[in-house]
């Protein structure tokens, strides 16, 4: 009977997260459908909703703080999943933060018109150190269409 090394007992736990990112400015009932899709894709796992900080009078009338407040009031069932993180400015900030929080697999739910763009952009920098920071998700970041 041989002794096993400690390493043979270690198994790295897979920790998955599904997320969405958008302007949501102003929030609409259509956004609730997107949030429903994010939850569905997560299959009971963790999911998060991030809003961009875009703010201009014409296309993005609400500032970030007000937008988060409205999103949480309009969609109370998702209030805990709507992230009001002031440090998030880009999609790279999101994936770096998720990786730093210990997630090993990530899925982004995006509009059908942006799936290819996000898939290419995010996976180009998976496991690459750079100005954007560092993240390394197993198999890259999966990007699925919101429908």
Predicted feature residues:
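Nucleotidyltransferase catalytic core that binds NTPs
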Residues: 2-147
């Amino acid at each position: 009977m041989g002794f096993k090394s400690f390493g043979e007992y270690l198994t790295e736990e897979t920790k998955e997260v599904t997320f969405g990112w958008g302007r949501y400015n102003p929030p609409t009932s259509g956004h609730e459908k997107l949030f429903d899709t994010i939850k569905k894709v997560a299959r009971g796992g963790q999911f998060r909703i991030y809003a961009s900080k875009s703010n201009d009078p014409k296309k993005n009338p609400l500032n970030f703080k007000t937008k988060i407040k409205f999103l949480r009031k309009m969609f109370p069932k998702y209030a805990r999943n709507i992230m009001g993180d002031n440090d998030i400015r880009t999609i790279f900030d999101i994936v770096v933060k998720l990786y730093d929080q210990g997630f090993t697999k990530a899925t982004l739910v995006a509009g059908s018109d942006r799936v290819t763009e996000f898939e290419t952009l995010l996976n180009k920098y998976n496991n690459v150190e750079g100005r954007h920071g560092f993240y390394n998700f197993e198999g890259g970041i999966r990007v699925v269409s919101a429908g």
